[in-house]
Amino acid sequence: MANIQGGQQIGTNQGKGQSAADKLALFLKVFGGEVLTAFARTSVTMPRHMLRSIASGKSAQFPVIGRTKAAYLKPGENLDDKRKDIKHTEKVIHIDGLLTADVLIYDIEDAMNHYDVRAEYTAQLGESLAMAADGAVLAELAGLVNLPDGSNENIEGLGKPTVLTLVKPTTGSLTDPVELGKAIIAQLTIARASLTKNYVPAADRTFYTTPDNYSAILAALMPNAANYQALLDPERGTIRNVMGFEVVEVPHLTAGGAGDTREDAPADQKHAFPATSSTTVKVALDNVVGLFQHRSAVGTVKLKDLALERARRANYQADQIIAKYAMGHGGLRPEAAGAIVLPKVSE
């Protein structure tokens, strides 16, 4: 049967000198009733590391005190001959500067718009600063693990950071989520012992890892889920604790902190996560499986806490929303930090 001739096609009949490729161009777009905002990003490090506030100044000092030993005193001996001085040093965290994120909303566009954007813009500004702080803390944790041998202890004898390499299974492959999960759990067993050997408290230990590796741990535990009810919730797909570590999945594990620009790859990025592993860089983006720590391993110093400011820009006929804070991040205790990494390709 031949195609019918004629018939209205409203979208293409747009008057003299007008044409449109879209035959539906003139039809009304009805508001769907929901604005598809970006999924919320949540800070994971803030409650899991040290936070200190200062009223003024450019940095905060954290004194470090070493250990001493006891010795028997025989009759006639002098304590002055046996005394061993307790060493002292310090860790200093500097304020990075004023970190900001802002948006400018023009009056005319606000008047034309049929849905609210201010609440979502405000949320996104706050999230961007929270993600920058998270990335900086995780990068500093990696930096502790990458300290050179000559400076990887605050005071000699207090303990060094731990780097553990996944062991390839005798059968199977680390590309199999179940085998990968088993390998990670095996290294967390060693990580637990390493921290305890450094006298790190058993409480407040955390293991940060990617969603892929988090899921691999779940896959390894699932066959025996009935025996591990205290460790995981199979229904929700969440892990509570493994080997004394709170397991936290972090999509932005290797993102690093903010820089001088707001691009995806910011210029002059502060607290950058190492990109490539080498003989001197033990933990980097290309080999990290996860980072483990005690909450005292890394610290954040706040000079100005997160705040929102609204300003009228009359010369632009617009409203400006600004999110800001002034903080600094730094490593404090190398002995309370560690990482699990992938084996080298040659291994």
UniProtKB/Swiss-Prot annotation:
Its biological purpose: Assembles with the minor capsid protein to form an icosahedral capsid with a T=7 symmetry, about 60 nm in diameter, and consisting of 415 capsid proteins. The major and minor capsid proteins are incorporated into the capsid in about a 90/10 ratio respectively. Once the capsid formed, encapsidates one single copy of the viral genome.
Oligomeric form and interacting partners: Homohexamer. Interacts with the connector protein and the minor capsid protein. Interacts with the capsid assembly scaffolding protein; capsid proteins and scaffolding proteins form building blocks that assemble to form the procapsid, each hexamer of the major capsid protein interacting with 2 scaffolding proteins.
Cellular localisation: Virion
Record flagged with keyword Transmembrane helix: no
Protein name in UniProt: Major capsid protein
Organism: Enterobacteria phage T3 (Bacteriophage T3)
InterPro entries reported for this sequence: Capsid_Gp10A/Gp10B-like_dom, Capsid_Gp10A/Gp10B_dom
Top-rank lineage group of the source organism: Viruses
GO biological process: viral translational frameshifting
Lineage, opening ranks: Viruses, Duplodnaviria, Heunggongvirae, Uroviricota, Caudoviricetes
GO cellular component: viral capsid
Gene: 10
Keyword Iron in annotation: no
Domain notes: The N-terminus interacts with an internal region of the major capsid protein subunit in an adjacent capsomere (intercapsomeric interactions) to stabilize the capsid.
Keywords associated with the record: Capsid protein, Virion
Family of this protein: Belongs to the T7virus major capsid protein family.
